[in-house]
């Protein structure tokens, strides 16, 4: 079954790492190991780091008109910073992979199963 591992954290905390080269290198190395471990286990199907929320555009269609707003829809303490798409047998396995995510120690990781239509597309269906 396909699951999204959604990585949330405080962008301010990440921004502070930019001034600490050693800490930033350690974080990048931890994520490289995490991705390599998922790849070696054959569960990784995709993933990416997201740009900061100030680069986001929210789109709404109201009364047939497209309205765009700079930034995310809602202000929150933690922002979505990246994701992984994994294919594992069950939620327990997905949670185990999420717990290994480097950001689990100081942010939060949401595990969400993909819907039936998304899973069918991932498996080569229509």
Q: Language-model segments: which ranges?
A:
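Conserved, structured core segments of small domains
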Residues: 1-126
